[in-house]
């Protein structure tokens, strides 16, 4: 399984640590989405920014439709 992560809110006004996590996930702004591996490290990053992103599990063959 992989995780599809979509940014639903802007990171303007967020602390620097949160902005770095969003950048580390590969998200560029509201509406952008990426497919990442379902590993403990990515899960931890997503957990820290759950208020800014939407997450869903997808099959292994999925790719990102927007970057």
UniProtKB/Swiss-Prot annotation:
Plastid as a keyword of this entry, yes or no, is: no
Look up keyword Ribosomal protein and say if it applies.
yes
Sorted alphabetically, the keyword list is: Ribonucleoprotein, Ribosomal protein
What is the superkingdom listed in this entry's lineage?
Answer: Bacteria
Q: Where are the transmembrane segments?
A: none
GO molecular function terms noted in the UniProt entry: structural constituent of ribosome
GO terms classed as biological process? translation
Q: Which family does it belong to?
A: Belongs to the universal ribosomal protein uL30 family.
Binding partners and assembly? Part of the 50S ribosomal subunit.
Q: Which NCBIfam families match?
A: rpmD_bact
Protein name, UniProt field: Large ribosomal subunit protein uL30
Q: Which organism is it from?
A: Sorangium cellulosum (strain So ce56)
